[in-house]
From Swiss-Prot:
<dbReference type="Pfam" id="PF03946">
    <property type="entry name" value="Ribosomal_L11_N"/>
</dbReference>
<keyword id="KW-0694">RNA-binding</keyword>
<dbReference type="InterPro" id="IPR036796">
    <property type="entry name" value="Ribosomal_uL11_N_sf"/>
</dbReference>
<dbReference type="InterPro" id="IPR006519">
    <property type="entry name" value="Ribosomal_uL11_bac-typ"/>
</dbReference>
<dbReference type="InterPro" id="IPR036769">
    <property type="entry name" value="Ribosomal_uL11_C_sf"/>
</dbReference>
<dbReference type="GO" id="GO:0006412">
    <property type="term" value="P:translation"/>
</dbReference>
<dbReference type="InterPro" id="IPR000911">
    <property type="entry name" value="Ribosomal_uL11"/>
</dbReference>
<dbReference type="GO" id="GO:0022625">
    <property type="term" value="C:cytosolic large ribosomal subunit"/>
</dbReference>
<keyword id="KW-0699">rRNA-binding</keyword>
<comment type="function">
    <text>Forms part of the ribosomal stalk which helps the ribosome interact with GTP-bound translation factors.</text>
</comment>
<dbReference type="InterPro" id="IPR020785">
    <property type="entry name" value="Ribosomal_uL11_CS"/>
</dbReference>
<dbReference type="InterPro" id="IPR020784">
    <property type="entry name" value="Ribosomal_uL11_N"/>
</dbReference>
<keyword id="KW-0689">Ribosomal protein</keyword>
<keyword id="KW-0687">Ribonucleoprotein</keyword>
<dbReference type="GO" id="GO:0070180">
    <property type="term" value="F:large ribosomal subunit rRNA binding"/>
</dbReference>
<protein>
    <recommendedName>
        <fullName>Large ribosomal subunit protein uL11</fullName>
    </recommendedName>
</protein>
<comment type="similarity">
    <text>Belongs to the universal ribosomal protein uL11 family.</text>
</comment>
Length: 142
């Protein structure tokens, strides 16, 4: 018989740098999960993606065991990395803060495809372009 699910916890944690400190500790501690076991396993699984923020969905079972699924990094994080900027624009329609080529947007869309609710890559590209526009990043041909 399948284990009884007690809780679903969603967090965004820097890859390879999870620690028992907030936000991980309190989020998992209240469900009685072995925090160090999660931290060790998460850091091992995300060691190759250091520098990115990786969303993770943790399923906590009634016997206090857990399983987790890592997702692809948020489009905004990938766009900021591609444009070489630290923060997005506070006024995206007035102040542009960076530029990204259309080919780079397509690469990001293809990477994000498993987590996006898009029928094809073209729809995913339009979603990523919309995110870029709302961040004040200009999309240029190339």
């Amino acid at each position: 018989m399948a284990k009884k699910v007690m809780a679903m916890v969603k967090l965004q944690i820097p890859a390879g740098k999870a620690t028992p400190a907030p936000p991980v500790g309190p989020a998992l501690g209240q469900h009685g999960v072995n925090i160090m076991a999660f931290v060790k396993e998460y850091n091992e699984r995300t060691a190759g993606q250091v520098g990115l923020i990786i969303p993770v969905e943790i399923t906590v079972y009634a016997d206090r065991t857990f399983s987790f699924v890592t997702k692809t990094p948020p489009a905004s994080v990938l766009l900021k990395k591609a444009a070489g900027i630290e923060t997005a624009s506070g006024q995206p329609h007035v102040k542009k803060v960076g530029k990204v080529t259309r080919t780079k947007v397509r690469e990001i869309a293809e990477l994000k495809m498993p987590d996006l609710n898009a029928a094809d890559v073209e729809a995913a590209v339009r979603m990523v372009e919309g995110t870029a526009r709302s961040m004040g990043i200009e999309i240029v041909e190339g």
